[in-house]
């Protein structure tokens, strides 16, 4: 690279005069030839910084200056945008930081050489006498904040590699050419505000002799005669490489990292200048990295700088032997191996060394030298490159390709045809290349060797750095945290000590120690707060080094809360907390969301329609001031869809739009154009007209969900009137439900159109005192578009209208006719009673065949054919529908055209990542992956082709996994039949452990009790009481004690009457007697449960809730696994209810068909039956009350149901 500003002064030669004593730090006189003719085509440009849309921001370009510039208002600091206009083209560059170019901890070393006269020979060049000592003069971190990569906006297949350390410098690869850009003068960062001139030139325009890369020296291992003496020195390293694989950290199957030591000799440093050479080298390596990211390579390789060494003068000339490339490469490789860090995990341990020089180490035209397949070798992984500007990046990429195993294209392979198109591994690098790419042979040769280069599998960006303390405040005092929060000089406030220092961090400055400030946050956990104590969760407590980290886990979901709206579709939520357990001591938070929602109250509101968004705006009328004034706020729909769930309102007085600084309420419609999608916590949720979340179902023109317009009618007409006096004059009405309403004047008129809500009397348009002007507004829950053009008014809304409206005119002149035409669409059931000539049926949807797509090309390249594919299209909205809607006999014949006429490149097998294993253990687990045959195209993209075009065996797409024995588990057999036919018995089953005594968990039970109907062998000998014939007591036959006493009467009634205890339960909680005081005195006694299968509409009652039915004083209670007091039959009855829904209900005083009055004596006599029985079970839907000594039956009619057993 040269100082191009000197070229413009037409200086043919520049003399750099220095003293010439040949020692370190002293340089001989050098003449540097700077012919302006070297660049046949170049342009001077002034790049600008822009935003994403390409709008000008500033002339600031450099990273160092951008930090100080107040005009840099880029919305995303992770992206930069620049505009460059050159060669008649606009390049809108979109850049992001190349965070993978410089490894963490990378350094730049400046070496210094001292030669001491003597008889000791140089260890590298035997023929030079003297003793050399080399020391590191200084070390500094390698700059990492100004390397960027990206592309050109809206141009596919482009790439950009640029640094902005000092202006813009790097490579721009467009769709048909490669360009280099660099500043005209260096070191002018602080003068960029006025614009900085850069030079842009084409790579193809660099005038130089074709570089014959066929002469570059790439030797095999047998050629390393000069390095035999290193076998012993590096034997241990080689063995270590074979025995110890470097850690493979997050490296994907096609993700490799070449960690580079960049050696730079003194000739390069002097040419570019010590203050600029680092920026230049960073740019150069950024370009090399981008070349290896080209998709044509087929493997993703990162070129990562871990160390850069700048050599002194004496060491530089000792390594390079003029005219002897093999000896020069041998010296460079030996030197690089001596720089290697012995620790494989050292951040500066390199995989490959790249050496740059401007010295002539070979014949004219030779640019680089490298061994083939030397990557990862302790000595052979190195290249020697002649540096000659940014185009040298291709030389470096070429030579590194040899080390990776690539041969020259056309030499020993069949890719000679690609050299003319600019392949990176072409033996002759021609100046006319327009676009570089990697040939198919380079990709194949790389894949042949890449898997053997284990050193490329580790990730330099994921080293095992020293473990950080679990508590972040351990390393920072309160004074330091104050300095971080408020700036230099601030310390912990000591003006008052009455507070716990861990509650809030208060800070003050020594200049005003009694003025304390806080950011309302506590100090970091781990901050020392007293001797032997630290802050933890806002408290100062004794230090405990054994605090265990605990990850969080979700607790159970709450019940769904109340609905956000009473009608018109609302939302209700349920939540869960991360407290089972909570994350503590640095543990992971719970994954996933802490809330769920569902739609509720989706029915339409029955009363007068109210706009939910309008209500929220109207609530701000009394207290929200805008520009120190209160307003009447109307709803406003923001044009940005992302902001429509934020509450924006429009002033009725001024038309100003104000943000109310809050989200709209859940359930508010996102848009007035979509009556179903709603806002949920600030996000628009898609809802179909079927009121299902995520549904795509839509209404037809008259509001039928999923309809086809068959029920739609169009109403239209013209109404003409001539006003005789001033004041509003009614023209006509438009009914509710109207959609796609259009009202317009037929001719220019001085009168003004007005619209009034018939239901409320509120003027929607042009009320009293309003100025008539074109506008879009929202009213009646819909959006209206009012337009005045050439004194002709028109009004349109998509509707639907929720209330009827009246169309009026405001006369401005008497005796001037006004003629209005109206048109709207409405459902046939809502058509108003008017002249039938004004009502026409809406046209049904019509369909036509339309070009849908083209078939896949018959050939992936080399010229094939494809045919048209036709689909059925609806004419009304041009949407594609199922082909059955179109007539098959009218389908057009397919049209043929040629395709893929580009020259063929060889398709390759590409395998994606393996999916998760289907099993965690056992013998049947497997995992799958997608394997495709992809053809690289000339535009840098890939195309999927048929597998027959890919050579070689198809990679496996299924493989076994997790084929390990599963932990032993208990196996259980089926339960046997009950051991008895009635009463209590037992059931048994077989329980086995297939692994002896090594099964996990507690052994399942093998015996359990079973309960069958009670045994009853007593014959019925007739009724034993006169009460058995009373109809009022007939329903007590379900009670075993009563049935036994009245067996004859009960058996007769069972065939004609439904069982009285099976009457359906009450439909409201008020109809269920839950207090024993409500029962007849004769029925108050311990009560068991009756199986009950009917459900109330309100909810089901589970066994776990039964214990609370009777209230705290109830006589009956049920708790699982508990034994109530009483006879065995009560216990068996509860067991029979095991898995059924049961209900405590009361016994009614009379059957549903009669009202019977029982005397107290009769009730007492009836109670004698139950005193002898073990339990009672009853059902009722009645609620009784006692008034004036009489029992009043308030029961409602009931339905009978059956009992399932």
Curated annotation (Swiss-Prot):
Cofactor binding: number and manner: Binds 1 zinc ion per subunit.
PTM comment: The precursor is cleaved by a furin endopeptidase. Glycosylated. Can be O-fucosylated by POFUT2 on a serine or a threonine residue found within the consensus sequence C1-X(2)-(S/T)-C2-G of the TSP type-1 repeat domains where C1 and C2 are the first and second cysteine residue of the repeat, respectively. Fucosylated repeats can then be further glycosylated by the addition of a beta-1,3-glucose residue by the glucosyltransferase, B3GALTL. Fucosylation mediates the efficient secretion of ADAMTS family members.
Cystine pairings recorded for this chain: 333-382, 376-455, 415-441, 482-507, 493-516, 502-535, 529-540, 563-600, 567-605, 578-590, 978-1010, 982-1015, 993-999
Primary location group: secreted
Record EC number: 3.4.24.-
Biased composition regions of type Basic and acidic residues, renumbered to the chain: 1185-1205
Subcellular location: Secreted; Secreted, Extracellular space, Extracellular matrix
InterPro entries: ADAMTS/ADAMTS-like (IPR013273), ADAMTS_ADAMTS-like (IPR050439), ADAMTS_CR_2 (IPR041645), ADAMTS_CR_3 (IPR045371), ADAMTS_spacer1 (IPR010294), MetalloPept_cat_dom_sf (IPR024079), Peptidase_M12B (IPR001590), Peptidase_M12B_N (IPR002870)
GO biological process: collagen biosynthetic process; collagen catabolic process; collagen fibril organization; extracellular matrix organization; in utero embryonic development; positive regulation of vascular endothelial growth factor signaling pathway; protein processing; proteolysis
Signal sequence annotation: 1-20
Name this protein carries in UniProt: A disintegrin and metalloproteinase with thrombospondin motifs 3
Domain (Peptidase M12B): residue spans on this chain: 256-460
Pfam families hit by this protein: ADAMTS_CR_2, ADAMTS_CR_3, ADAMTS_spacer1, Pep_M12B_propep, Reprolysin, TSP1_ADAMTS, TSP_1
Cofactor: Zn(2+)
UniProt keywords, alphabetically: Cleavage on pair of basic residues, Disease variant, Disulfide bond, Extracellular matrix, Glycoprotein, Heparin-binding, Hydrolase, Metal-binding, Metalloprotease, Protease, Repeat, Secreted, Signal, Zinc, Zymogen
The TSP type-1 domain, residue ranges: 551-606, 845-905, 906-965, 966-1014
Binding site for Zn(2+): 398, 402, 408
Glycosites: 83, 119, 242, 345, 475, 814, 942
Comment block on domains: The spacer domain and the TSP type-1 domains are important for a tight interaction with the extracellular matrix.
UniProt organism field: Homo sapiens
Region span, Disordered: 1174-1205
């Amino acid at each position: 690279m040269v100082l191009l500003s000197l070229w413009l002064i037409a200086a043919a030669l520049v003399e750099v005069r220095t003293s010439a004593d040949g020692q370190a730090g002293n340089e001989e006189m050098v003449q540097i030839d700077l012919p302006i003719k070297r660049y046949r085509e170049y342009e001077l440009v002034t790049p600008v910084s822009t935003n994403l849309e390409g709008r000008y921001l500033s002339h600031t370009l450099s990273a160092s200056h951008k930090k100080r510039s107040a005009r840099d208002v880029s919305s995303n600091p992770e992206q930069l945008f620049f505009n460059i206009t050159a060669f008649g083209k606009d390049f809108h560059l979109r850049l992001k930081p190349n965070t993978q170019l410089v490894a963490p901890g990378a350094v730049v070393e400046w070496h210094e050489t001292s030669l001491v006269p003597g008889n000791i020979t140089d260890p590298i060049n035997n023929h030079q006498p003297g003793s050399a000592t080399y020391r590191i003069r200084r070390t500094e971190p390698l700059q990492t904040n100004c390397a960027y990569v990206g592309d050109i906006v809206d141009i596919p297949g482009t790439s950009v590699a640029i640094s902005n350390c000092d202006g813009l410098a790097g490579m721009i690869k467009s769709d048909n050419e490669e360009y280099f850009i660099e500043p005209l003068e260096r070191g002018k960062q602080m003068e960029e505000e006025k614009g900085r001139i850069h030079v842009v030139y084409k790579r193809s325009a660099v005038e130089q002799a074709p570089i014959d890369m066929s002469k570059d020296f790439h030797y095999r291992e047998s050629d390393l005669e000069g390095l035999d003496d290193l076998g012993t020195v590096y034997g241990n390293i080689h063995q270590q490489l074979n025995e110890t694989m470097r850690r493979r950290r997050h490296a994907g199957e096609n993700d490799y990292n070449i960690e580079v030591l960049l050696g730079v000799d003194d000739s390069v440093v002097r040419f570019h200048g010590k203050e600029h050479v680092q920026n230049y080298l960073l740019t150069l390596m950024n370009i090399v990295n981008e070349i290896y990211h080209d998709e044509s390579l087929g493997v993703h390789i990162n070129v990562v700088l871990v160390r850069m060494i700048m050599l002194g003068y004496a060491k530089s000339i000792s390594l390079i032997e003029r005219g002897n490339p093999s000896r020069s490469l041998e010296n460079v490789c030996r030197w690089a191996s001596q720089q290697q860090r012995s620790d494989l995990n050292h951040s500066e341990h390199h995989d490959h060394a790249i050496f740059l020089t401007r010295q002539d180490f070979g014949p004219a035209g030779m640019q680089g030298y490298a061994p083939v397949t030397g990557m990862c070798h302790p000595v052979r992984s190195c290249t020697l490159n002649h540096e000659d500007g940014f185009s040298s990046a291709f030389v470096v990429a070429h030579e590194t390709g040899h080390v990776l195993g690539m041969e020259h294209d056309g030499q020993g392979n069949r890719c000679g045809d690609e050299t003319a198109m600019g392949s990176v591994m072409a033996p002759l690098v021609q100046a006319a290349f327009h676009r570089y790419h990697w040939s198919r042979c380079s990709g194949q040769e790389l894949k042949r060797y890449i898997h053997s280069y284990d050193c490329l599998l580790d990730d330099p960006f994921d080293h095992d750095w020293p473990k950080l303390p679990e508590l972040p405040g351990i390393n920072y005092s309160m004074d330091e945290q104050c300095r971080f929060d408020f700036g230099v000089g601030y310390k912990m406030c000591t003006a008052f000590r009455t507070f716990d220092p861990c509650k809030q961090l208060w800070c003050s400055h020594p200049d005003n120690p009694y003025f304390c400030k806080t950011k309302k946050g506590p100090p970091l956990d781990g901050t020392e707060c007293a001797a032997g104590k630290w802050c933890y969760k806002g408290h100062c407590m004794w230090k405990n080094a054994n605090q265990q980290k605990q990850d969080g886990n979700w607790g159970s979901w709450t019940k769904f809360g109340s609905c956000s709206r009473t009608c018109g579709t609302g939302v209700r939520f349920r939540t869960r907390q991360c407290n089972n357990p909570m994350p503590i001591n640095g543990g992971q938070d719970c994954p996933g969301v802490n809330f769920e929602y569902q739609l509720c109250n989706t029915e339409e509101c029955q009363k007068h329609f109210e706009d939910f968004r309008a209500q929220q705006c109207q609530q701000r009328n009394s207290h929200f001031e805008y520009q120190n004034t209160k307003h009447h706020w109307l709803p406003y729909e923001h044009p940005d869809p992302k902001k429509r769930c934020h509450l924006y309102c429009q002033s009725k007085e001024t038309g100003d739009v104000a943000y109310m600084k809050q989200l709209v309420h859940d359930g508010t419609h996102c848009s007035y154009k979509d009556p179903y999608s709603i806002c949920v916590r600030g996000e628009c949720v898609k809802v179909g007209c079927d009121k299902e979340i995520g549904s795509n179902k839509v209404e037809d023109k008259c509001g039928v969900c999923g309809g086809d317009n068959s029920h739609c009618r169009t109403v239209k007409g013209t109404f003409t009137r001539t006003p005789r006096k001033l004041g509003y004059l009614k023209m006509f009405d438009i009914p509710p439900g109207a959609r796609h309403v259009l009202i317009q004047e037929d001719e220019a008129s001085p009168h003004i159109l007005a619209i009034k809500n018939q239901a409320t009397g509120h003027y929607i348009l042009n009320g009293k005192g309003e100025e008539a002007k074109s506008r879009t507004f929202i009213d009646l829950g819909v959006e209206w578009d009012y337009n005045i053009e050439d004194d002709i008014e028109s009004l349109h809304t998509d509707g639907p209208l929720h209330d009827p409206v009246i169309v009026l005119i405001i006369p401005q002149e008497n005796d001037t006719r006004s003629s209005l035409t109206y048109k709207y669409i409405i459902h046939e059931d809502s058509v108003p009673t008017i002249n039938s000539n004004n009502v026409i049926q809406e046209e049904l949807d019509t369909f036509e065949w339309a070009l849908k797509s083209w078939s896949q090309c018959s050939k992936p390249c080399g010229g094939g054919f494809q045919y048209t594919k036709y689909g059925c299209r609806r004419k009304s909205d041009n949407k594609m529908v199922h082909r059955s809607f179109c007539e098959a006999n009218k389908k057009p014949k397919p049209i043929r055209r040629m395709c893929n006429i580009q020259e063929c490149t060889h398709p390759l097998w590409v395998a994606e990542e393996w999916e998760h294993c289907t099993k965690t253990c056992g013998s049947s687990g497997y995992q799958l992956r997608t394997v495709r045959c992809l053809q690289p195209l000339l535009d840098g993209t890939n195309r999927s082709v048929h597998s027959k075009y890919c050579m070689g065996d198809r990679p496996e797409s299924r493989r076994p996994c997790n084929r390990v024995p599963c932990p032993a588990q208990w196996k259980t057999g089926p339960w046997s039949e009950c051991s008895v036919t009635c009463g209590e018995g037992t059931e048994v089953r077989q329980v086995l452990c297939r692994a002896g005594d090594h099964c996990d968990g507690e052994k399942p039970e093998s015996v359990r009790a079973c309960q069958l109907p009670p045994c009853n062998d007593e014959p019925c000998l007739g009724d034993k009481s006169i009460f058995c014939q009373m109809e009022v007591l007939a329903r007590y036959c379900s009670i075993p004690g009563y049935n036994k006493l009245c067996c004859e009467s009960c058996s007769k009634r069972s065939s004609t009457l439904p069982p009285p205890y099976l009457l359906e339960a009450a439909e409201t909680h008020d109809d269920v007697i839950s207090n024993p005081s409500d029962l007849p005195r004769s029925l108050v006694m311990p009560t068991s449960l009756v199986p009950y299968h009917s459900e109330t509409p309100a909810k089901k009652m589970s066994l776990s809730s039964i214990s609370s039915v009777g209230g705290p004083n109830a006589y009956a209670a049920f708790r699982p696994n508990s034994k109530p007091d009483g006879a065995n039959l009560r216990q068996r009855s509860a067991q029979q209810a095991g898995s059924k829904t049961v209900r405590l209900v009361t016994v009614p005083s009379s059957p549903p068909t009669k009202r019977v009055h029982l005397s107290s004596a009769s009730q007492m006599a009836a109670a004698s039956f139950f005193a002898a029985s073990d339990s009672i079970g009853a059902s009722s839907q009645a609620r009784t009350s006692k008034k004036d000594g009489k029992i009043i039956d308030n029961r409602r009619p009931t339905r009978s149901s059956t009992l399932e057993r």
